[in-house]
Amino acid sequence: MALELILVLSSLIVILIIFFSFKSNGKSENKLAKLPPGQMGWPFIGQTIPFMQPHSSASLGLFMDQNIAKYGRIFRTNLLAKPTIVSADPDFNRYILQNEGRLFENSCPTSIKEIMGPWSMLALAGDIHREMRSIAVNFMSNVKLRTYFLPDIEQQAIKVLASWENTPEAFSAQEQGKKFAFNLMVKHLMSMDPGMPETEKLRTEYHAFMKGMASIPLNLPGTAYRKALQSRSIILKIMGQKLDERIRQVRDGCEGLEQDDLLASVSKHPHLTKEQILDLILSMLFAGHETSSAAIALAIYFLDSCPKAAQQLREEHVEIARQKAERGETGLNWDDYKQMEFTHCVINETLRLGNIVKFLHRKTLKDVQFKGYDIPCGWEVVTIISAAHLDPSVYDEPQRYNPWRWQNISATASKNNSIMSFSGGPRLCPGAELAKLEMAVFLHHLVRKFHWELAEHDYPVSFPFLGFPKGLPIKVRPLEKSEA
């Protein structure tokens, strides 16, 4: 009897959801006659499933292609049970990002908030987001990049690439990029040394955490999402111990404390709670690790497909190394980095075609009008930032990897065209320059040490995060002495 009652109540709930879904959709569409065209899809789930289908990161995907062909670059749908405007219009996307806090606000999915934490920069808006972002910006300022980050980036790159020597079998370039980025971030966030037991423990839990980020958000025993929440607790415990240790050392007046890591930065904000600090550290580990590791893997992938670019890149770095040797200098400096002109073209093109971040979630704070369309207050807005990178009206042959296109674009135009790679407006990624610096330094040593080729076919896939289905397996062979 109890089971029958549960079934009846469950059926009634489903019917009510469907009824109110249709009813609310109908009201929304009748209220404003100039909503963007589109369809809401199935009741409740809408078009979430086709929207989230994996596809090549160098494309918009079948869902976007079909809807753009049918409705144009701005259309309406239902994603994650919410009425949503999807924009592949570069002008509208920039308008959205530039009006953050006035017409639009960040709208992080609930599942991401739960796994990243309520104080993660991904989830915050308003004054608290500005404060957290200010900490991140100061931590990764140009001065810090030159004096604090650059030497360690080079040291970690040399260490990772040294492990590739005498390795005849194929290995995952994606995993090597992740190892490089992770070791670098934990050292600069919390002064944790690579290879130490607590660092390896953190890395193991972080990988489980990331698998849950890319899973269906079902908090049930055995699911990747549940395991990710458990890993989050372990990660925060490890980070909390490091924070408590630093606070104790400062209180006891210990000498020789690290003054440049993130723990030192947050100690200057005593009003922040421990929970806020730990969520900030975790969100910065996530942002710094995922962006940089993906960018390095993409560069390896695209350069393999474009030998001419790889050779020109190699020639640039061999020449930089030769000039440094003549001056008796060791170790890269900021002037060397600025001298890497073709390298910056490679970086821009890799970010453009690779599309590490495909879209952003926003929500309207008031009724918005744009290009003749009315967008109601409270609606979700998904900006497809990769659309500008693949727009033939902006880039000739946008599907082709062509670093030389950036040689003909002024610095201002380059900034305007590439800024979407790292979001924009008040939420522009504070680690954008750090990611580019990591790419440049890694490539400087990679192209002077090795030739490489894909061991088997693989390609970058979007959704929910960028990755290579096979891990980007490569084989390497050392350069001849005459080439280096």
From Swiss-Prot:
InterPro entries: Cyt_P450 (IPR001128), Cyt_P450_CS (IPR017972), Cyt_P450_E_grp-I (IPR002401), Cyt_P450_sf (IPR036396). It is found in: Membrane. The chain crosses the membrane at residues 2-22. It comes from the Eukaryota. Keywords: Cholesterol metabolism, Heme, Iron, Lipid biosynthesis, Lipid metabolism, Membrane, Metal-binding, Monooxygenase, Oxidoreductase, Steroid biosynthesis, Steroid metabolism, Sterol metabolism, Transmembrane, Transmembrane helix. GO terms for cellular component: membrane. It catalyses: cholesterol + reduced [NADPH--hemoprotein reductase] + O2 = (22R)-hydroxycholesterol + oxidized [NADPH--hemoprotein reductase] + H2O + H(+). It is a single-pass membrane protein. It is an enzyme of class 1 (oxidoreductase). Its EC number is 1.14.14.-. One of its GO terms (molecular function) is iron ion binding. GO terms for biological process: alkaloid biosynthetic process; brassinosteroid biosynthetic process; brassinosteroid homeostasis; cholesterol metabolic process; saponin biosynthetic process. Heme binds at C429. Expressed in roots. Pathway: Steroid metabolism; cholesterol metabolism. Involved in the biosynthesis of steroidal saponins and alkaloids natural products from cholesterol such as spirostane-type saponins and polyphyllins, compounds with pharmacological activity. Belongs to the cytochrome P450 family. This is Cholesterol 22-hydroxylase CYP90B27.
